[in-house]
Amino acid sequence: MPAIALDPIHQFEVTKWLDLRLGNIDISFTNASGFMLLGVVLVIGFFSMATRKGELVPSRLQSVAEMGYGFIADMVRSAAGEEGLKFFPFVFTLFFFILFANLIGMVPYAFTTTSHIIVTGALAMTVILMVIVVGLIKNGLGFFKLFAPSGAPLPIYIILTPIEIISFLARPLTLGLRLFANMLAGHIMLKLFAGFTVMLIGAGAIYIPVAALAFAMGVALNALEFLVAGLQAYVFAILTCVYLNDALHADAH
């Protein structure tokens, strides 16, 4: 068996599909670009097909789309309030892009774009930049009250304000790392169990019971990874709503 077949890291390698350069800048179209584009196309295609007819008695596909719409709307309303609903399109797009990217990664030989920190980090930075812009537009300099607990004595201000600033600056780091680490670790484990199963089967009949156990664990891990794919999209979206709520109501802190 080729060593590459058992290498759990090889699946994350970014490869060029189309070599493109703009002067000294490499703008090649890679497998990461392709699968991100595929995710966008699938999201648009799914909701376009589901809502094409807009029947009063919804079809199964339309029902799923409406459930997704209602789920995100309820999430935004509960975490960011009625005022946060103006950001529903952003949170909706973010959730389903991450969800479809995670699910695409579960297809054999597909590429998991969310297992790369450059992708999850870019998404996290987009969220935090939006939070800062919204906070400044909504509250002006009052946005900085977010870092100063109201009603606290001066010594507490001196201690807590730097902590609050560091905590805020760490948000994009933790937001991006959480998604990246979960997807990376999960796919490494899937690859290892699959590789062990094949290796044990090839080692002889005596190892068949152990291979069967490894296969069963791999199947269970696959089911868990589908759950993680949805859960991580939800966590990313709900934290986005929480951060937007902080920006919208900074003067309440």
Curated annotation (Swiss-Prot):
It is found in: Cell inner membrane. Belongs to the ATPase A chain family. PANTHER family: ATP SYNTHASE SUBUNIT A. It holds the Pfam family ATP-synt_A. It comes from Hyphomonas neptunium (strain ATCC 15444). Keywords: ATP synthesis, Cell inner membrane, Cell membrane, CF(0), Hydrogen ion transport, Ion transport, Membrane, Transmembrane, Transmembrane helix, Transport. The chain crosses the membrane at residues 27-47, 87-107, 117-137, 146-166, 196-216, 224-244. Its main location: membrane. GO terms for cellular component: plasma membrane; proton-transporting ATP synthase complex. The keyword Iron does not apply. It is a multi-pass membrane protein. InterPro entries: ATP_synth_F0_asu, ATP_synth_F0_asu_AS, ATP_synth_F0_asu_bact/mt, F0_ATP_A_sf. This is ATP synthase subunit a. Key component of the proton channel; it plays a direct role in the translocation of protons across the membrane. F-type ATPases have 2 components, CF(1) - the catalytic core - and CF(0) - the membrane proton channel. CF(1) has five subunits: alpha(3), beta(3), gamma(1), delta(1), epsilon(1). CF(0) has three main subunits: a(1), b(2) and c(9-12). The alpha and beta chains form an alternating ring which encloses part of the gamma chain. CF(1) is attached to CF(0) by a central stalk formed by the gamma and epsilon chains, while a peripheral stalk is formed by the delta and b chains. It comes from the Bacteria. GO terms for molecular function: proton-transporting ATP synthase activity, rotational mechanism.
